[in-house]
C-alpha cells in the first residue's frame, strides 16, 4: 500500500491544479563554492530540484544553450575560458533556476571568495588559489596595498566578523620557488546592518523545496492511511453486528 500511496500522492499533487508558475524554482550550487577559478581547475555544478518518480533527468543550460548532460550534477574536469558564463538547470517538477556565474581566469594566482558584498558581522573567507594548486609560500593578503595577513605556507584567510573597516581592495601574493607572483585586485564591500537569521540559514533554497514537497506528500499519505483504516474499522464493525451467535445451556446448569 505504501508503494502505491507515495507515487499516487505526488501525481495527484501535480495533476490537481499545479500550474507551471506554482512549481518551485530549481537551484544551482557550485562545488567547491568558488565562482572564480583558474584554467585547468575542476568544477562541479549541482542542481537541486524536485523530480517525479517517472523522470529524474535534469536540463542544463550554459549561456542559454542546452547542454547534453541530463545528470543532476554537471562536472567540468579541466576548465577553460570557454566554460565561463551563466549556468542554469531545470527539472520536470521545478522551473528554471536563477543563473549562477562561473568565471575562468588565466594566471598564476587568483583571490577567491564566495561573494564580494557582505553585511556587518558576516564571516569572510578568502583563498589565495594557485594554478594547478602549485605549492606557494610566503603568502601575504593585502588590503588597500597594505599587508593584512602573512602565512609562511599558503593558507586561507578568515575574518570572523566583518566591519566597515574591512571594505576595500584586496589581492594576494606569494612565491613559486623564487618567482614572486600576485593576483588581480578585487573589491570587497561591507554594508551596514546585521545579517538576519532565517530558515534559509538552516535549509538551503533547494532543500526548502524538497522539505515542502515531502511535507505535502506526508500529508497525502497520512490522509490516505486515515481513510483506509476508517474503512477497515467500519467493515469489521459491520461484520461483527451481522454475525449471529447461538447460545446453549451447559448441562450442569440444569
UniProtKB/Swiss-Prot annotation:
Glycans are attached at residues 56, 63, 92, 180, 187. The chain crosses the membrane at residues 209-229. Changing residue 212 to A: Has no effect on complex formation with CD247 or FCER1G. Decreases cell surface expression. It comes from Homo sapiens. One of its GO terms (molecular function) is immune receptor activity. The lineage of its organism: Eukaryota, Metazoa, Chordata, Craniata, Vertebrata. Residues 1-16 form the signal peptide. Keywords: Cell membrane, Disulfide bond, Glycoprotein, IgG-binding protein, Immunity, Immunoglobulin domain, Membrane, Phosphoprotein, Receptor, Repeat, Secreted, Signal, Transmembrane, Transmembrane helix. This is Low affinity immunoglobulin gamma Fc region receptor III-A. Induction: Up-regulated in a monocyte subset upon exposure to IL10, TGFB and MCSF. Disulfide bonds join 47-89, 128-172. Changing residue 226 to A: Decreases the association with either CD247 or FCER1G. Decreases cell surface expression. It is linked to Immunodeficiency 20: A rare autosomal recessive primary immunodeficiency characterized by functional deficiency of NK cells. Affected individuals typically present with severe herpes viral infections, particularly Epstein Barr virus (EBV), and human papillomavirus (HPV). Changing residue 197 to P: Impairs receptor shedding. Impairs the detachment of NK cells from opsonized target cells upon sequential activation. Forms a heterooligomeric complex with ITAM-containing signaling subunits, either a homodimer of CD247, a homodimer of FCER1G or a heterodimer of CD247 and FCER1G. Interacts (via transmembrane domain) with signaling subunits; this interaction is a prerequisite for receptor complex expression on the cell surface and intracellular signal transduction. Binds the Fc region of antigen-complexed IgG with a preference for IgG1 and IgG3 isotypes. Interacts with CD2; this interaction is involved in NK cell activation and cytotoxicity. The modification Phosphoserine is found at residue 236. Its main location: membrane. Changing residue 208 to A: Decreases the association with either CD247 or FCER1G.
Amino acid at each position: 500500500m505504501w508503494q502505491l500511496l507515495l507515487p499516487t500522492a505526488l501525481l495527484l499533487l501535480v495533476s490537481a491544479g499545479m500550474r507551471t508558475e506554482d512549481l518551485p524554482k530549481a537551484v544551482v550550487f557550485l562545488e567547491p563554492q568558488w565562482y572564480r577559478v583558474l584554467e585547468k581547475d575542476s568544477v562541479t555544478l549541482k542542481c537541486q530540484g524536485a523530480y517525479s518518480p517517472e523522470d529524474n533527468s535534469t536540463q542544463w543550460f550554459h549561456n542559454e544553450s542546452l547542454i547534453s548532460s541530463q545528470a543532476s550534477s554537471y562536472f567540468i574536469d579541466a576548465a577553460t575560458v570557454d566554460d565561463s558564463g551563466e549556468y542554469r538547470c531545470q527539472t520536470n517538477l521545478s522551473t528554471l533556476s536563477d543563473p549562477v556565474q562561473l568565471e575562468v581566469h588565466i594566471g598564476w594566482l587568483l583571490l577567491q571568495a564566495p561573494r564580494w558584498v557582505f553585511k556587518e558581522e558576516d564571516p569572510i573567507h578568502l583563498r589565495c588559489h594557485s594554478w594547478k594548486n602549485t605549492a606557494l609560500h610566503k603568502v601575504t593578503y593585502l588590503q588597500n596595498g597594505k599587508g593584512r595577513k602573512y602565512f609562511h605556507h599558503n593558507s586561507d584567510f578568515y575574518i570572523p566578523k566583518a566591519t566597515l573597516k574591512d571594505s576595500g581592495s584586496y589581492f594576494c601574493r606569494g612565491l613559486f620557488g623564487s618567482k614572486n607572483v600576485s593576483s588581480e585586485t578585487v573589491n570587497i564591500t561591507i554594508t551596514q546592518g546585521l545579517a538576519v537569521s532565517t530558515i534559509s540559514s538552516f535549509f538551503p533554497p533547494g532543500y526548502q523545496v524538497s522539505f515542502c514537497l515531502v511535507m505535502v506528500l506526508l500529508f497525502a499519505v497520512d490522509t490516505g492511511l486515515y481513510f483506509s483504516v476508517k474503512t477497515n474499522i467500519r467493515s469489521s464493525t459491520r461484520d461483527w453486528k451481522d454475525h449471529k451467535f447461538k447460545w446453549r445451556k451447559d448441562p450442569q446448569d440444569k
